[in-house]
Regions:
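Aromatic "clamp/platform" in nucleotide-sugar-dependent glycosyltransferases that forms part
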Residues: 291
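Short alpha-helical donor nucleotide-sugar binding micro-motif in glycosyltransferases
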Residues: 270-271, 278-283
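Carbohydrate-associated surface elements
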Residues: 168, 191
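Conserved acidic donor-binding segment of nucleotide-sugar-dependent glycosyltransferases
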Residues: 323-324, 328-335, 344-349
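A conserved mid-protein helix/loop that constitutes part of the nucleotide-sugar donor-binding site
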Residues: 20, 210-233, 247-253, 328, ...
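Membrane-proximal helix-turn-helix segments that form the acceptor-binding/catalytic region
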Residues: 142-162
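Nucleotide-activated donor-binding/catalytic signature segment of Leloir-type glycosyltransferases, i.e.
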Residues: 253-271
Length: 399
């Protein structure tokens, strides 16, 4: 099959769950013999560029990065890429059997083309992310949320099939109550490249049984302030290393100083994927205190490295973390529960080690990319065959 993915950025430009998902799926479906391309954002100065990466073709469509623009920067950047993608697709859509949108990337395109079958994978919904972030939205973000919600509904309504990364994500989509004709709604989880659990990248990082790791963007929705506050109740020998960057970093740095835990909490900033994995392997466990997660890829990555996790009992997290099997679940709004989970993992190393091994087995069985690519391929074939039958039926009726 000729398949085009649309994703605003890829892991070699920006580290994130959607970016990793798109890259891994493209790579593994290429290995299964398909002709894969990924349409992503490129330089306005260079125009359309294409090159090979991991066996698939990357096509960069020129757009204007607007993050520094004084008014509506996020919305304008999103629109800039999607207009560029739409213009490119007007000329090139017929080259592909399937066009697969990742999140809101490409939302202008779906118009139920008979020649092209359109899929959309939903990784989250903007109104829920903002709701659970527990922060006051400024005017820019309120306007962005309104438009982004419309973009999501447009992609949902006009795609031939919709994929959710978890049962929780599918429940959230069902609550939108959009009046649409019946269409396939499928659940295919995110995965992890098991090979990446091997030692790569910075080999100078040594094991440290006193360090717990957080990986994620520094945003209130990730529960970062609750985590720092919980560190005051955690065993004094435990150190927290936080990997990632985000809009709340400056505020978090001041909060760490105010809470008096500067000697035990270290912000490392954004890291390469290899170094993230090595930091995970260094710690005794990983903690993710998010207020909302549709799945949580980093939990799978930690388990793949043989590490137990302490995570919020919210959203799609319980679909990948079974309490006291491959990690511990807690209420992210309860500071004491967060601290208790970290202390339990720290004070019971044999139990923590066994949870990590359980997690490694779980990921290998259910969340490896080879299996997910095969499942996705099967869904493509099923939807294409169904659409072909409908088209043939319409033709017979017309005749």
């Amino acid at each position: 099959m000729r398949i085009l993915y649309i994703c605003k950025s890829l892991p070699h430009r920006y580290q994130g769950g959607i970016q990793t998902h798109t890259s891994e799926l493209a790579e593994h479906l290429t290995q299964r013999g398909h002709d894969i391309s990924v349409l992503t954002a490129g330089s306005i100065r260079k125009g359309v560029q294409s090159y090979e990466m991991k066996g698939f073709t990357v096509i960069e469509a020129p757009y204007l990065p607007m993050r520094r623009f004084p008014f509506l920067p996020i919305l304008l950047e999103e629109l800039s890429f999607n207009v560029s993608a739409w213009l490119w697709l007007k000329k090139n859509q017929f080259k592909y059997d399937i066009v697969h949108l990742q999140g809101r990337s490409g939302f202008l395109f779906p118009k139920k083309h008979n020649e092209t079958t359109v899929f959309t994978t939903f990784h989250g919904l903007i109104h829920l992310e903002n709701k659970f972030s527990k922060q006051i939205l400024n005017l820019d973000r309120r306007i962005h949320q309104r438009f982004a919600s419309y973009f999501e509904k447009n992609a949902f309504k006009n795609s031939d099939a919709v994929i959710s990364v978890s049962h929780e994500m599918q429940r959230e989509l069902n609550q939108l109550k959009i009046q649409i004709e019946e269409k396939p709604r499928l659940i295919i989880p995110n995965g992890v490249a098991v090979k990446k659990s091997h030692n790569e990248g910075n080999t100078d990082i040594k094991s440290d049984n006193n360090t717990i790791i957080f990986v994620g963007r520094l945003d209130r929705i990730k529960g970062i302030f609750q985590l720092v506050k919980a560190m005051k109740k955690v065993d004094k020998n435990v150190k927290l290393v936080m990997l990632g960057d985000g809009m709340n970093r400056t505020e978090l740095e001041e909060f760490i100083r105010t809470e008096g835990v500067s000697d035990r909490v270290e912000l490392m900033g954004a890291q390469s994927n290899d170094n993230v994995l090595n930091w995970i392997k260094r710690g005794f466990a990983l903690v993710l205190p998010s207020f909302h997660e549709t799945q949580g890829i980093v939990l799978l990555e930690a388990n793949t490295c043989g590490k137990a996790v302490a995570a919020s009992n919210v959203g799609g997290v319980p679909e990948v973390v079974t309490h006291e099997y491959n990690g511990l679940l807690f209420n992210p709004y309860n500071i004491q529960e967060i601290a208790d989970a970290i202390n339990q993992l720290y004070r019971n190393p044999e139990m923590t080690k066994q949870m990590g091994e359980n997690g490694r087995k779980l990921v290998a069985e259910k969340f490896n990319w080879s299996k997910i690519a095969a499942d996705t391929e099967g869904v493509y074939k099923q939807v294409l065959a169904s659409k072909k039958c409908k088209d043939e039926l319409k033709l017979e009726v017309a005749l």
